[in-house]
UniProtKB/Swiss-Prot annotation:
Part of the DNA-dependent RNA polymerase which catalyzes the transcription of viral DNA into RNA using the four ribonucleoside triphosphates as substrates. Responsible for the transcription of early, intermediate and late genes. DNA-dependent RNA polymerase associates with the early transcription factor (ETF), itself composed of OPG118 and OPG133, thereby allowing the early genes transcription. Late transcription, and probably also intermediate transcription, require newly synthesized RNA polymerase. It catalyses: RNA(n) + a ribonucleoside 5'-triphosphate = RNA(n+1) + diphosphate. Belongs to the poxviridae DNA-directed RNA polymerase 18 kDa subunit family. GO terms for cellular component: DNA-directed RNA polymerase complex; virion component. Its EC number is 2.7.7.6. Signal peptide: none annotated. Keywords: DNA-directed RNA polymerase, Transcription, Transferase, Virion. This is DNA-directed RNA polymerase 18 kDa subunit. The DNA-dependent RNA polymerase used for intermediate and late genes expression consists of eight subunits Rpo30/OPG66, Rpo7/OPG90, Rpo22/OPG103, Rpo147/OPG105, Rpo18/OPG119, Rpo19/OPG131, Rpo132/OPG151 and Rpo35/OPG156. The same holoenzyme, with the addition of the transcription-specificity factor OPG109, is used for early gene expression. Apparently non-glycosylated.
Protein backbone atom coordinates (compact mmCIF):
# COMPACT_ATOMS: atom_id res chain seq x y z
CA UNK A 1 0.00 0.00 0.00
CA UNK A 2 1.19 3.49 -0.82
CA UNK A 3 0.01 6.78 0.59
CA UNK A 4 0.23 10.51 0.02
CA UNK A 5 -0.91 13.68 1.80
CA UNK A 6 -2.69 16.53 0.04
CA UNK A 7 -4.59 19.71 0.80
CA UNK A 8 -8.03 19.86 -0.73
CA UNK A 9 -11.67 20.77 -0.43
CA UNK A 10 -14.17 18.01 0.28
CA UNK A 11 -17.80 18.82 -0.60
CA UNK A 12 -20.40 17.76 1.97
CA UNK A 13 -24.16 18.23 2.08
CA UNK A 14 -25.87 19.49 5.22
CA UNK A 15 -29.61 19.48 5.79
CA UNK A 16 -31.28 22.65 7.16
CA UNK A 17 -31.68 21.16 10.66
CA UNK A 18 -27.87 20.67 10.80
CA UNK A 19 -27.23 24.42 10.42
CA UNK A 20 -27.26 25.12 14.15
CA UNK A 21 -24.76 26.30 16.75
CA UNK A 22 -23.13 22.85 16.41
CA UNK A 23 -22.31 23.49 12.76
CA UNK A 24 -18.58 22.74 13.13
CA UNK A 25 -19.35 19.37 14.71
CA UNK A 26 -21.97 18.65 12.05
CA UNK A 27 -19.50 19.53 9.26
CA UNK A 28 -16.81 17.32 10.82
CA UNK A 29 -19.27 14.41 11.17
CA UNK A 30 -20.47 14.84 7.57
CA UNK A 31 -16.89 14.86 6.22
CA UNK A 32 -15.93 11.74 8.19
CA UNK A 33 -19.12 9.91 7.24
CA UNK A 34 -18.76 10.68 3.53
CA UNK A 35 -15.00 10.26 3.04
CA UNK A 36 -13.09 8.56 5.89
CA UNK A 37 -12.22 4.92 5.06
CA UNK A 38 -14.30 5.03 1.86
CA UNK A 39 -12.81 3.87 -1.44
CA UNK A 40 -13.43 6.55 -4.07
CA UNK A 41 -11.77 6.48 -7.51
CA UNK A 42 -9.05 4.05 -6.46
CA UNK A 43 -7.95 5.84 -3.31
CA UNK A 44 -9.15 5.89 0.29
CA UNK A 45 -8.89 8.68 2.85
CA UNK A 46 -7.18 7.16 5.90
CA UNK A 47 -6.83 10.41 7.86
CA UNK A 48 -8.67 13.72 7.50
CA UNK A 49 -7.83 16.92 9.35
CA UNK A 50 -10.22 19.82 8.87
CA UNK A 51 -8.20 23.01 8.47
CA UNK A 52 -9.30 25.58 11.03
CA UNK A 53 -6.77 28.16 9.73
CA UNK A 54 -8.55 28.49 6.37
CA UNK A 55 -11.85 30.33 6.01
CA UNK A 56 -14.79 28.15 5.09
CA UNK A 57 -16.10 29.07 1.61
CA UNK A 58 -19.74 30.08 1.25
CA UNK A 59 -22.17 27.21 0.98
CA UNK A 60 -24.40 26.59 -2.01
CA UNK A 61 -28.11 25.79 -1.71
CA UNK A 62 -28.97 22.68 -3.72
CA UNK A 63 -32.42 21.03 -3.47
CA UNK A 64 -33.19 22.44 0.00
CA UNK A 65 -29.76 21.39 1.33
CA UNK A 66 -26.51 23.29 1.73
CA UNK A 67 -23.35 22.03 0.00
CA UNK A 68 -20.13 23.18 1.68
CA UNK A 69 -16.58 22.69 0.38
CA UNK A 70 -14.57 21.94 3.53
CA UNK A 71 -10.80 22.68 3.50
CA UNK A 72 -8.91 19.60 4.69
CA UNK A 73 -5.51 17.92 4.90
CA UNK A 74 -6.15 14.39 3.62
CA UNK A 75 -3.93 11.32 3.85
CA UNK A 76 -4.88 8.94 1.05
CA UNK A 77 -3.94 5.27 0.68
CA UNK A 78 -3.94 3.28 -2.54
CA UNK A 79 -2.68 0.01 -3.99
CA UNK A 80 -0.74 -0.65 -7.22
CA UNK A 81 -0.95 -3.60 -9.59
CA UNK A 82 2.02 -5.78 -8.64
CA UNK A 83 1.91 -5.01 -4.90
CA UNK A 84 2.30 -8.08 -2.70
CA UNK A 85 -0.12 -8.22 0.22
CA UNK A 86 -0.76 -10.66 3.06
CA UNK A 87 -4.16 -11.71 4.39
CA UNK A 88 -6.54 -14.49 5.37
CA UNK A 89 -7.76 -16.97 2.75
CA UNK A 90 -11.57 -17.16 2.74
CA UNK A 91 -13.25 -19.94 0.72
CA UNK A 92 -17.05 -19.70 0.71
CA UNK A 93 -17.59 -22.10 -2.20
CA UNK A 94 -15.91 -23.18 -5.44
CA UNK A 95 -16.58 -19.87 -7.18
CA UNK A 96 -16.03 -17.44 -4.30
CA UNK A 97 -12.42 -17.48 -3.08
CA UNK A 98 -11.03 -14.27 -1.55
CA UNK A 99 -8.16 -13.04 0.58
CA UNK A 100 -9.16 -10.52 3.27
CA UNK A 101 -6.43 -7.94 3.93
CA UNK A 102 -7.99 -5.26 6.13
CA UNK A 103 -9.22 -2.59 3.69
CA UNK A 104 -8.42 -4.78 0.67
CA UNK A 105 -10.31 -7.75 -0.78
CA UNK A 106 -8.39 -9.93 -3.24
CA UNK A 107 -10.54 -12.10 -5.49
CA UNK A 108 -8.93 -15.24 -6.87
CA UNK A 109 -10.09 -16.23 -10.34
CA UNK A 110 -10.96 -19.78 -11.37
CA UNK A 111 -7.69 -20.17 -13.28
CA UNK A 112 -5.68 -19.30 -10.14
CA UNK A 113 -6.20 -22.81 -8.79
CA UNK A 114 -8.87 -25.31 -7.82
CA UNK A 115 -11.10 -25.67 -4.78
CA UNK A 116 -11.66 -29.03 -3.13
CA UNK A 117 -13.87 -30.06 -0.23
CA UNK A 118 -12.37 -32.70 2.04
CA UNK A 119 -12.50 -33.50 5.75
CA UNK A 120 -15.50 -31.16 6.12
CA UNK A 121 -13.54 -28.10 4.96
CA UNK A 122 -12.57 -26.29 1.79
CA UNK A 123 -8.99 -26.30 0.47
CA UNK A 124 -7.46 -24.30 -2.36
CA UNK A 125 -4.89 -26.06 -4.58
CA UNK A 126 -2.35 -24.18 -6.70
CA UNK A 127 0.83 -25.56 -8.30
CA UNK A 128 0.80 -28.62 -6.08
CA UNK A 129 0.39 -26.61 -2.86
CA UNK A 130 -2.70 -26.97 -0.66
CA UNK A 131 -4.01 -23.94 1.23
CA UNK A 132 -6.59 -24.48 3.99
CA UNK A 133 -9.47 -22.08 4.50
CA UNK A 134 -8.55 -19.42 7.08
CA UNK A 135 -4.75 -19.50 6.78
CA UNK A 136 -2.48 -16.50 6.12
CA UNK A 137 -1.31 -16.27 2.50
CA UNK A 138 0.53 -13.75 0.32
CA UNK A 139 -0.89 -12.56 -2.98
CA UNK A 140 0.22 -10.35 -5.84
CA UNK A 141 -2.34 -7.81 -7.10
CA UNK A 142 -3.16 -8.32 -10.77
CA UNK A 143 -6.06 -6.06 -11.77
CA UNK A 144 -8.13 -3.40 -10.02
CA UNK A 145 -11.87 -4.05 -9.76
CA UNK A 146 -14.81 -1.89 -8.75
CA UNK A 147 -14.38 -1.41 -5.00
CA UNK A 148 -16.98 -1.70 -2.30
CA UNK A 149 -17.90 1.24 -0.11
CA UNK A 150 -15.11 0.64 2.42
CA UNK A 151 -12.71 -1.76 0.66
CA UNK A 152 -10.42 -1.88 -2.34
CA UNK A 153 -11.03 -4.89 -4.60
CA UNK A 154 -8.38 -6.50 -6.82
CA UNK A 155 -8.03 -9.69 -8.80
CA UNK A 156 -4.98 -11.46 -7.38
CA UNK A 157 -2.89 -14.61 -7.49
CA UNK A 158 -1.45 -16.41 -4.49
CA UNK A 159 2.32 -16.16 -4.25
CA UNK A 160 3.65 -19.71 -3.88
CA UNK A 161 5.96 -20.04 -0.90
Amino acid sequence: MSSFVTNGYLPVTLEPHELTLDIKTNIRNAVYKAYLHREISGKMAKKIEIREDVELPLGEIVNNSVVINVPCVITYAYYHVGDIVRGTLNIEDESNVTIQCGDLICKLSRDSGTVSFSDSKYCFFRNGNAYDNGIEVSAVLMEAQQGTESSFVFLANIVDS
